């Protein structure tokens, strides 16, 4: 992707987030974006929209199906994308919208990797640790299970990581022995 395309994607995303923020509807926008991104993942819609073999009329039909969202701003955004023939960039724009919402609201997705599934009490403690250590509000809690950690956990928020896994401690111990 070129710098020009990246700048275009960021401009569309920032504009949508600004409008939603001014009208205090970031939560509704975030829900719409997550639902549409889920549709992209389950249907490979991104390939259809970016394909030159698919006629523009078909792309319009595909995006019209997404307009059932509750947000007026999302529907207007989709209309603008169709009008300017930017369908190929929609997936990246929506990803960027989520990043912009996180920045504006200081609410980031938290990825927790542990050797066993977390209990509800552990999830609430993770949210408290994230709020204290990273000074952010925890958004969605994305839980991953990786038995190779042996024990402990890895918390990742906004490109920052806390790694208390036994696997990492064993690796550090091994490096110290060399």
Curated annotation (Swiss-Prot):
Localization terms from the record: Cell membrane
Entry GO terms, CC: plasma membrane; proton-transporting ATP synthase complex
Family matches, as SUPFAM superfamilies: N-terminal domain of the delta subunit of the F1F0-ATP synthase
Membrane topology: Peripheral membrane protein
UniProt keyword list: ATP synthesis, Cell membrane, CF(1), Hydrogen ion transport, Ion transport, Membrane, Transport
Primary subcellular site in the record, as a coarse category: membrane
Gene Ontology molecular-function annotations: proton-transporting ATP synthase activity, rotational mechanism
Function: F(1)F(0) ATP synthase produces ATP from ADP in the presence of a proton or sodium gradient. F-type ATPases consist of two structural domains, F(1) containing the extramembraneous catalytic core and F(0) containing the membrane proton channel, linked together by a central stalk and a peripheral stalk. During catalysis, ATP synthesis in the catalytic domain of F(1) is coupled via a rotary mechanism of the central stalk subunits to proton translocation. This protein is part of the stalk that links CF(0) to CF(1). It either transmits conformational changes from CF(0) to CF(1) or is implicated in proton conduction.
Family affiliation: Belongs to the ATPase delta chain family.
Subunit structure: F-type ATPases have 2 components, F(1) - the catalytic core - and F(0) - the membrane proton channel. F(1) has five subunits: alpha(3), beta(3), gamma(1), delta(1), epsilon(1). F(0) has three main subunits: a(1), b(2) and c(10-14). The alpha and beta chains form an alternating ring which encloses part of the gamma chain. F(1) is attached to F(0) by a central stalk formed by the gamma and epsilon chains, while a peripheral stalk is formed by the delta and b chains.
Annotated protein name in UniProt: ATP synthase subunit delta
Species name: Streptococcus pyogenes serotype M2 (strain MGAS10270)
Organism placement in taxonomy: Bacteria, Bacillati, Bacillota, Bacilli, Lactobacillales
